């Protein structure tokens, strides 16, 4: 058998791989310092073009070497390895046990793949091989709570100096009216057990007269600030999996405004800052802060 064409093909393959490696190395390096400052991009592209031309030429040479190879006319023989099964002394030849183990592993692989193919053909459109009759429990939705659930939740909340009252002007979603001592009033628009909006006004302002009054802001700046902070707390306490806890936490936080005009700021110790009292309440400790002092 003539081995010279094979050696030529292998040599040409090494040359081709080397030229391809130079292309990727040049692409990874990018523009180098030896390209200079003027026209460095053009020099880089020219160098890359030359390397690609070299790869193309080496590929053609490799294809010509492949065409010169002639396939063997006779099947390949195992030569002396065909007599390994006749070897009786395992200490002299340790390859035979490994071959036997490989054949056993191949037989098991073929058997298991046959079983897997049969199961996949029977369950081609199913994600599971077996039929499962259990249905996944639907997750509770906080905006689909019944009116009785809302009534029971609000009825179980009791605080001093706070009055809670539920109204349903449209017989669907509830509006929770909160009165804190003689300090302020608030309208909490609920969708099921989900808080959608909070309107805060002074104690003397109209809030229960009509539906429109429950969406308009207060004419006092201090209560508009409290309303903005209530929206922040509403988003902070929101919990789709525990909506009852979210409402309880929000009402507990909102009740801390009973001392809106009494407690000083915990940071600066002053009652007024920019003509406003401490309108912010910490979400965990409920301590009063001015909006500029809470940072």
From Swiss-Prot:
The keyword Transcription applies. Component of the Mediator complex, a coactivator involved in the regulated transcription of nearly all RNA polymerase II-dependent genes. Mediator functions as a bridge to convey information from gene-specific regulatory proteins to the basal RNA polymerase II transcription machinery. Mediator is recruited to promoters by direct interactions with regulatory proteins and serves as a scaffold for the assembly of a functional preinitiation complex with RNA polymerase II and the general transcription factors. Coiled coil: none annotated. InterPro entries: Mediator_Med27. It holds the Pfam family Med27. This is Mediator of RNA polymerase II transcription subunit 27. Belongs to the Mediator complex subunit 27 family. GO terms for molecular function: transcription coactivator activity. It comes from Anopheles gambiae.
